Structures are given as C-alpha cells and as structure tokens.
Amino acid sequence: MTKFVFVTGGVVSSLGKGIAAASLAAILESRGLKVTLIKLDPYLNVDPGTMSPFQHGEVFVTEDGAETDLDLGHYERFITTRMKRSNNFTSGQIYKNVLEKERRGDYLGKTVQVIPHVTNEIQEFVKRGAGIGSHSGDDAKFGVGEPVDVAIVEIGGTVGDIESLPFLEAVRQLSLKMGPTNTAFVHLTYVPFIAAAGELKTKPTQHTVQKMREIGIQPDVLLCRADRPIPDEEREKISLFTNVALHGVISVWDADTIYKVPRMLHEQGLDEMICMKLQLLTKPANLSRWDRLVKEVEHPRREITIAMAGKYTELSDSYKSLNEALRHAGIQHHAKVNIEYVDSETLTPETAGELSKFDAILVPGGFGKRGIEGKIVAAQYAREHGIPYLGICLGMQVATIEYARHKAGLAGANSTEFEPDGPHPVIALIDEWQDADGSIQKRDANSDLGGTMRLGAQSSDVKAGTLAHEIYGDVVTERHRHRYEANQKYLQRLQDAGLVISAITQREKLTEMVELPRSVHPWYVGVQFHPEFKSTPWDGHPLFSSYIAAALEHHAALQKEAA
C-alpha cells in the first residue's frame, strides 16, 4: 500500500519546501524505497505556462509535455523517478474539472460545494499522482503515475492562506481515511533571529502549528528553518508548545549548497522517524554519493564565468534549471561555474565590449520583444570574437536572426513574434507538428496562449559530421516549449551563407539545432529545445558538458594571452 508524507509550510513562503521534500525523497530512495513527489499549487491558474517568470520563476516541462512548477525540477534532480503531468496540479485545474463535471450533470443535481466536491477532487488528483487510479475518464485525461512505496506531497503556499484551506482539508480527510500508519505530516517553519535581541524567536513557529491544529492537523515533524543551527534549549521550547516530540523538531540551517540538505536531515533522524511512523522496514540509508557530490562542489580545480544575457535577470529562479545544468557540467569537469547575468535591455553594440571578459556567452529562452536586440548583440559578439556560444530556444532564434542579418544579407531579418510584417521573417509561428504520441497539433495566430505550445519530448535526426552529432549521436530527444521556429523558406539561404542546420525533424522539417563549422568558430550552437530539464548532478548533460569544456579552453587561451 502506498504511504503518504504531506509537506506544508508556515510563517513565510520561500523557505525551501521543495528542497526539503526532494531531500527526504532522496534519503528514502537511498533506503531502497520507490518514491515520487507531487506538488499542489493553490493558485487559480490552470498551469504556470502563462505566468510571468517574475511572478512564478521557471516553468519546468516534463517529458509528457506538462508545464509545471519549478519544484518538479528539484524533484527530478534529486531522485530517479521522472515527473509527469500527474505530479503537479493547481486550484485552477481542480475547479475547472469540478465545473466541467457539474455541467455534464455528473453530480446528479446536488449543490456543488468546496466540501465535499472540491476536496474529493483534490484527493483523486493526489492518488493519481501516487499511481492509484480511479478507473474513470480522469485517469486518461490527467494521467496516472507509476505505483510507488511512498508519495511525498508538497502543498504550496503558507498555512493560514485562504487559497490553501481546501488542500489542507483534503489531505486531512485523506489521512483519516488511510489511517495513522499510512500518512505523516512534515511542517516547514521559520525561526527568525532578531539581531537587536540577539536571540532566535520561536513564537511564529508556535503560531503556525496552532493554526494547523485548528484545521485538524498535528504535525509529526517540524523542520525549523533558520540562518544558524537551533540550540537544544529552543528546540525543547518548540516541542513543548507545539506538541511535537523533541526528536521531531529538526534544525535546518542555511547551507552553501542545496546538496548538503539530505545529509543534514538524515543526521537528525528525519528518515528514521518517517519510516517508523509509516511502519516501513528498509535497509539503512546510503548517502555516499551525496557526500561525493558535495566534495566535488566544495573543491573545484578550475573556475570559469559564463555571461547569461536575458531579461529576467532580477530573479534567478527564472533560470533555475539552466543554472543547475551549468553547475552540473562544471562538476563533470571539476570546475566551478560562475554565472553573471547581463540585462539584455542594456546591451548595445556600444556596450558589447563588456562581454569580452567572459569565458562563454549564453542566451536563454524567453518570450516577447523586450530586450531582444540586446540578445542579438550578444550572439553577434560571441560569433565575431570566437567566444563559446549556446543559444537555448529563443537563444537559437536570435542567433539565426543575427546570422541572417549580418552574414546572409537579409537586412531587417526578424521573427514574426517581434515584427509580424517584417521583410524577412526568418523565424515564424509553427502551424502544425506531430507530438511524440503521434497526434497532430495545429495552431494559428488566434490560438489561446495557455497550453498551445509545442511541448514535451520531441525527437529529430542529427546530421553526421557536426558538433551536434559528436554530442548526441544520430538522434536527439529533448523537451520543448515554444511556438516559433526557423522559417523553412529561409533555410537554404542561411545554409548557403555558412550556417549549419545540424538537427531537423523528419516529418515537419523543423530546425532543432544550428551551429557554425569548427573551422569558423570553436563552439557556436543554438538549440530549439530545453536541454537543461534533463540535467542531473550525477550525470550532467552532454550538451552542457561540451559547452563547459569549450569555455574552459577559451579561459585557458585568455590566460595564456594575458601571461
């Protein structure tokens, strides 16, 4: 029988529930258990696909094409289970499905209410994510996860928020139905240090647990976040006023790398408490690979700096998976990768010289016209000065636009996203494609923004003799999230000018990778997909590994010139 661990948060948001949940999952997996994670988001958006990165951070794309919360990226990087559409759902999805059922008459004329209809729907979504299907049409509609031993369910938001109440009530009911040996509650809270008083304050934690108990939930474990280890005296005080056993009050202090958190939680007995509560007999945890990973992170042999030219630079969460993928590749090369954000809105031909100090340049994905000319400047500077360049999604498109303007003689080349009536639309809207499941998707300029992009895992053929072929072999399969592509009408003109189309889909002839020959540039690649979503700290990713290797070579060359 599948066991459930519910992870909630209190006092303030952004405490790291996702990292805590993923760390617990990693420890349980090291004990031989099959684990999955499910994220419940209380906002009314159907998914985060149309939300601003400044509001939400990165949108993580799963293999099956779901646009999900960035925490699912942490989940995939911490455990071996791959996330699916069923691993993340929102209030918007829940209410939408309830209202559709009401319109169909599924409720047989009953008054539709938050309790029981919305809370029952939440429970069904949770169970599907844990591999427990309901044998209804919703199983096919939303997908069902693989059966697991333990499902860790992270409830977004903060206890006390109005939006979270139906979710908390739903998991309270679910825990009652399943029994105390099949469910556990872990509550992440905040213990602030007041500098003027010179002490940690436990009152906010007492109040957030009181709020949970009013709802009918008694936490089994408290993860107490602070900027320092919490002394035993304060832990005893928290235990007394929250009715949580002392050994269940765990100190979680700030760490210089998230990969230290599994060891931190294990050494304080979190996994042992959960296994005892859920009556799970397992082998001892083995975190040796986490220890090796932390050692690699803390003892790099070399150091490089990457310039990331984007417009969401004020919030690093906008590029969370990308940042991690670069660091993973650095680990593979025993190198520390520093990432310096360059605001593309301020980048002009006159200021482009500031890019000369970097070991490589990267233009990430994005949407909209704002900052686009600065990204084109970054691509041009990298091409003209032999600096390793990686363009991802929009980054490939701006590299194509730049090459069309300055090498293919297509003055005014642009994307129809930014200039619908431009003279040379070298990037244009995709109107038809075939998904991995064989279904044909069609779109036009009047399609809704939400859920209408080319999403999820897609495959393409790789041209022999290219850098792309060295990295991927004959076929590349990566996750996508875009609605614009290189215009097929201009491909021959671009190739005649020297741009290499190194990966292309069989059916639609959509351009997936472009590059420059090694004889022209040491490492210049653009990809239409998002390889960062498949990178892990254990294996890295071959594209990023090749990119970082080129950056290290460029760094060595710069040092040699300076000597």
UniProtKB/Swiss-Prot annotation:
Residue numbers binding L-glutamine: G366, L394, G395, M396, Q397, E417, R483
Binding residues for ATP: S14, L15, G16, K17, G18, I19, D71
One Pfam match: CTP_synth_N
SUPFAM superfamilies: Class I glutamine amidotransferase-like, P-loop containing nucleoside triphosphate hydrolases
Residues annotated as the enzyme's active site: C393, H530, E532
Xref: InterPro entries: Class_I_gatase-like, CTP_synthase, CTP_synthase_N, GATASE, GATase1_CTP_Synthase, P-loop_NTPase
Region (Amidoligase domain): 1-280
GO terms, molecular function: ATP binding; CTP synthase activity; glutaminase activity; identical protein binding; metal ion binding
PROSITE patterns on file: GATASE_TYPE_1 (PS51273)
Residues annotated for UTP binding in this entry: S13, K201, T202, K203, P204, T205, Q206, K237
Further comment found in the protein's record: CTPSs have evolved a hybrid strategy for distinguishing between UTP and CTP. The overlapping regions of the product feedback inhibitory and substrate sites recognize a common feature in both compounds, the triphosphate moiety. To differentiate isosteric substrate and product pyrimidine rings, an additional pocket far from the expected kinase/ligase catalytic site, specifically recognizes the cytosine and ribose portions of the product inhibitor.
Function: Catalyzes the ATP-dependent amination of UTP to CTP with either L-glutamine or ammonia as the source of nitrogen. Regulates intracellular CTP levels through interactions with the four ribonucleotide triphosphates.
Protein name as it appears in the record: CTP synthase
Organism the protein comes from: Leptothrix cholodnii (strain ATCC 51168 / LMG 8142 / SP-6)
Lineage per the UniProt record: Bacteria, Pseudomonadati, Pseudomonadota, Betaproteobacteria, Burkholderiales
